[in-house]
């Protein structure tokens, strides 16, 4: 069990797939709960066509006797990230399996996480790549190998961003009014403020 029951929320945008997965795997083994948002914006280094050829090769792997036994090929970005993390965990042991249960990866930002702060992992950032290095996003790869909800997620994200921008503008106005109210009240409460500060409070 981790030191806190609260989940670590990470925004997947502009993170490298393998590097972020290794950080998340370590946190899971330490007992933390991890939530990864916007999995479709996670980045894979290298040319897109090379990444697609590698994934198409993976899609051809199956059980000859009965393909329903596996291998199971996930198309959704969240599931691709989940499987990447699974490969970094001892998931066939009880410890690894329990750790994997604490991982959630979502496309877009679900409603319950829209008002929570998300973290960024600098060591897994896309900007660690060389400036001329090519890269592609997992969302595009998923779309081209069979994921059908790219447009749906894009529409929901556009709505969320408009709503978030309106909320931010309203918050700026309220903060400005609060600062002005403190300035207006300062002369009236000056004598009381001196008493409070004399007692050791700010």
Curated annotation (Swiss-Prot):
The keyword Transport does not apply. The keyword Protease does not apply. It comes from the Eukaryota. One of its GO terms (molecular function) is structural constituent of ribosome. One of its GO terms (cellular component) is cytosolic large ribosomal subunit. Belongs to the universal ribosomal protein uL13 family. This is Large ribosomal subunit protein uL13. The gene is rpl-13A.
